């Protein structure tokens, strides 16, 4: 019973141990070991071991080295000796001795975690006493602590080597980036190079540099994270203000100094001559490179994520200086850079000489050529110091300024004179002197997009809807010879003031300005009459009168510009001396008013408005001007009286919208749309061709060589025909049977066809109007020529006209004509049945009828649904 309870208890403990976390298992193991120690001490009556067994780790090692272990499973993962995971659970039973089997209680089997430090760390004791096991566990713990100490020392040494390398790289980068010119400061932030920590230089460098405190360590770690996002190499720049050559750039990884002694040695190697500036570049060998001409290393700016950023302009950086700094520095009238050497940290005023008259050359925005063969420079009137400018602005200032003492600048007075005369570059240069400290008086309306657009919109609205006062608009018009004046002055506070007289300026888009530039004695009326030219071309006046107004009444709209001044009546009106006032515009569409030399008002087609003779334009002329010329036949659109607007009936509106919806007409530009390919001459085509035949038959038949030349005498009863001596005018006249004179001529006249004949030259002239090539017309004539005597009868001419139309439709000429074509032009044939073609036509007609029926059905359904809802 006791054994059964113990077995149940052991199983219950094992289940609980399997569910407990690792810390609870360790505590349980420590408690079991303490109980085991107490029982062993009581059994053997031996003093306690000097080795402290109060820690769970020591007891764990002691249990691992015990030899009396039963049912020990093979641990998994023997290669990972330092792992602290569960390598295997073992049941351990440790008897106390030979005589204690009955007196001492049996220890409960507890799961023990076996941790193997290394193969050599396990020591097998020679004695089976608990003291030997504790000693072995203490030895294992001591050995493992030594290994841990060695690893910690290696890690500390590696960390110190990396920190020393970072110190050296930061010192070198700061030295090279202090005077970096032409690039933003973000280009020179030092990055963390990938260094070999096993090199002897890195190991020895830890002896020369003190370890930093914990706070500095944390700050440095944050700085390292920021540096690691950038590139792993830094371009070495010059040391004392000169710009590095693009071909002498060396990565920092190759020339980074190993310790502070190397840094001091490289800094002492820098030497600057007072007469000239030498550029020192840190390359692999440490030699200096002289650059006779400084060049700016242009590298694209990139964000930490790698995106390319457009670098800011140096001029923008100079202009972005805030006003409080400008007020503190003031202006310098000598146009020089004072304290230029203070822009470069670490250099004295003796190293760099003062530069006077330096500036940026301004080019024309039109062609990029310097004005007048001389460079217009911007005198820099600010005395800039390192206290005023930030490092980025200092770098931008040095990059933007060309250090050339020989460059000459223009004084402010000359710039003001050039600006007043209209020199664009001089005006820009004068504007850049004071930056934003410039006041403008007067506007330029044509250079303001919103104002120009508003004026165009108002013109368009006026042309469409009419209204407004013409005199106000014309009084504001600008004369052609107008020359704007711009004055630049200085107020009491020293601020530049630009005054312009271009208020309410409206420029004419005419090209006849040179004609009236020298005439200064023109008043307002003369300035308005000077637009009238002797030319009759309307295009010359479109630009001059594009902003003139016109009014509109109910009958028609009339323009207010005389474009036909060559008319003698209009010239007489212009030369009239009796006109002393203004005559109102006549709104009558059928008549106009004018004033002659005697002062009487007469009804003419002209009217006077502010002294300008104006001809009223009819509605036909205005519509004709807007119409587009085309070769196609313009259809006739029926017009309906708008009686429904007055009566309120809305049924006519639907008829107006759908009146021309289904109307079709013949389009000469697209004849195939109106063509029905039936293969014979239709009745409509035959009637059209017969009209041409009747009009042009019997013409110039006397030109034929076989036509008789004798005069034909006619009976007195045949007076209606009025025959002439020329036989060509005998339009089928028939002689009576009683007349036997000239039988040959009578027989000839009687042998002519009843419909008459047409000369081949006349037919050719008619067919050539189709613009078909002559060889094609010759083929058509050969197909239809049946008489072979230079003439064509009615059937031949009609078929020839039909073939010409077929060629215009795009069809090819057949090798021979089908008999049905000849039958279709016969006057006695009413209809020609073609089963194939007529079936196709009927099919098309049926489809059209079906579509119409479907539309009608849908319309009726919609109406029925609407009635149901109502």
Swiss-Prot record:
Keywords: Lipid metabolism. The keyword rRNA-binding does not apply. Residues 739-828 form the EH domain. Residues 532-548 have a biased composition (Acidic residues). Residues 75-86, 184-208, 238-259 have a biased composition (Polar residues). Residues 1-11, 299-310 have a biased composition (Basic residues). Belongs to the IRS4 family. Positive regulator of phosphatidylinositol 4,5-bisphosphate turnover and negatively regulates signaling through the cell integrity pathway. Involved in rDNA silencing. This is Increased rDNA silencing protein 4. It comes from Candida glabrata (strain ATCC 2001 / BCRC 20586 / JCM 3761 / NBRC 0622 / NRRL Y-65 / CBS 138) (Yeast). The lineage of its organism: Eukaryota, Fungi, Dikarya, Ascomycota, Saccharomycotina.
